[in-house]
Amino acid sequence: MRSTGYLLTLSAAFQVAQAAVTANNSQLLTWWHNTGEINTQTPVADGNVRQSGLYSVKVQTTPASSSLYYDSFVYLAIPGNGMSDQLQYTQGYNQTQAWTSFLYSHDATVKISRNGSSANSNVVIRPTSLNFPVRYDNQSVYITVPYSPTGYRFSVEFDDDLISLAPSGARQPENALLIFASPFENSSTKPQPGSPNSIAPAPGRVLGLNTTSASTVVFNPGVYYFTGHDHMVLSSSVTWVYFAPGAYVKGAVEFLSTASEVKASGHGVLSGEQYVWYADPDEGYQKASGANNNGLRMWRGTLGNSSQTFVLNGVTVSAPPFNSMDWSGNSLDLITCRVDDYKQVGAFYGQTDGLEMYPGTILQDVFYHTDDDGLKMYYSNVTARNIVMWKESVAPVVEFGWTPRNTENVLFDNVDVIHQAYANAGNNPGIFGAVNNYLYAPDGLSSNHSTGNSNMTVRNITWSNFRAEGSSSALFRINPIQNLDNISIKNVSIESFEPLSINTTESWMPVWYDLNNGKQITVTDFSIEGFTVGNTTITASNAASVGRIDGVDPAYAGSVHYID
C-alpha cells in the first residue's frame, strides 16, 4: 500500500527544485532535469518532464573511489498521460511506469529509495535469470549491475507494491520501476560536436525541421516539444536524429529522406505523451474517425526506388499513441532495420505494437512494454534476440497472422516475458500467435476457417529460449492461414498458467482451408523441444494435461513432434 505521505505528495502538481549531483566521467554518465514535475493527475507543462514522486535512484560505479552516489532522474509514464478523456483507451489497471537510464563502462551499484517509505520490502528483479546481487539497509535497496557491452534492461519490483489483476490473477507492480543500464555511445551513434551539416534546435517549441538543409538534427540535453497537434516531419536532407542523454523530446519522428541509411540514436527520450490515442495527422491529430490505420507512429519513413536501412540505437520511447512504426513506399522489400538497445515504455494505450521488422532486420537488446502485437513476424530473414517484454492485455508476444504471407528464415531467441495479464480469448492471448485474415475477421477472431492461401508458406522458423515469468497464457494459438513448414519451438519455459476458466491458456491450431479453391492448408514438421511448465517437461503424453496443448486439429496432430 502507498504511504499517506506519498498520496499527499502526489495530490497536486508542482515543479521540483533539487540540487542534483550527476556523473559525467569515463565510467559513468547520469543526468537530471531541473523542470521535473511530480504530477500523476494532469498533463505536465510543455517545458517540464513528468517525474516519479515515489522513487529516487542514485548510481555509483564499483569499485568506487568515494562513497558518493550520483543522482539519476526517474521519469514517469501514466495511463492517458493525464488526459482524463483518454483513459477509456488504456488497459484500465491504473498502474504507472517509472524508469531511469544511465551509461556506464564499469560495474555499477544502483541505490533505490522510496520517498515516504522504508525499504523493508523484498524486491524481485525481472528477468529473474539476471540474479543480480541485492542488499538492503533501513532506507534503500542496492543492486549490483555488472558491466555488459550490451547493457541491461530490467524491472525492480517491491513485494508490498504488487497488486493482483483480475481475472488473470497476475501479480504486477502498481508503481513499476525500470532500470536501463547502457554502454557509452561511440562515433557511430553520436555525431561529432559542431558538425557543419547539423542543426541543434533550442529547447522549447520546435519549428522548421521540415525546411532545414542540415543532414543531422541534434537534440542536446533539455526539453523540447511539438504540441499534440504537430510532429517532427524532417526535410528530405535529414538522415540522422540524435537524442543526447538528458534530451526529452515530446513528439514523433517522420523521415522524408530516401537515402540509403536513416538513423535515430542517443540515449534521450522521445515521448508521445501530448497525443491522444490513435491521433490522426489528417484529422488534426484527433482520434481517427474510423479504423483507417492512419494513427500517428513514433517512427515513420517513406521509401524511394532504392534500398534503405533504418538504424535505431539507444533511444527510449515513452507513451506511444498508436502502432510504433511504419514505412511506406513502392516496396517494403527495400527497407531493413538495425535496432540495438531500444526501449519502449508507458505503452498503456491499445494498439501500441512493437517495431516492424522488415526483411533482413536484426533487432537485439530491446525492452518492450506493449499493448498489442509484440514481436511482429511478417517478413523474412529476420533475427531478434535478447528481448525483455512486458506484455499488456492484448495480442500475443509473437504475432504472424492478419494476412497470408510467404515468410522464411526467422530466428527469435532469448526472450524474457516478465509479465502478461490477459482477460479472455478475445484478447488474442499466447506466446506465439497467428490471428485470422483481417479482410474477413477485422479483429482477428472468426469461426470462418476458409480464409487461407495454400500457395503461401511460412517456413524455417525458430523460436528459442523464451521464458514466461508469473502467470502465462497459452504456448500458441495459431490460425494457419498459409502453409507451415519446419517450425521449431525450442526451450520455452512457462512458470505457471492463468486460470483455465478465462480461456486463455489452451493451445490450438485448427484446420484451415484456401479461400479460393477450398484446399486444406498444410502443416509439416512442427516441433516442440524442451518445453517446460513449472518443473515439468512436456512430452506427447502430458502435452494436453500439463502443457494445455489440446486444440491441435487431428489433420495436423501427426505433424506436431515433441522432443524432451
Curated annotation (Swiss-Prot):
Its EC number is 3.2.1.57. GO terms for molecular function: isopullulanase activity. It is found in: Secreted. Keywords: Glycoprotein, Glycosidase, Hydrolase, Secreted, Signal. Pfam families: B_solenoid_dext, Glyco_hydro_49, Glyco_hydro_49N, IPU_b_solenoid. Residues 1-19 form the signal peptide. One of its GO terms (cellular component) is extracellular region. Gene3D superfamilies: Dextranase, N-terminal, Single-stranded right-handed beta-helix, Pectin lyase-like. Glycans are attached at residues 24, 94, 115, 138, 186, 210, 305, 381, 448, 455, 460, 486, 491, 503, 535. N-glycosylated. The keyword rRNA-binding does not apply. It catalyses: Hydrolysis of pullulan to isopanose (6-alpha-maltosylglucose). Hydrolyzes pullulan, a linear polymer which is composed of maltotriose units with alpha-1,6 glucosidic linkages, to produce isopanose (Glca1-4Glca1-6Glc). This is Isopullulanase. The gene is ipuA.
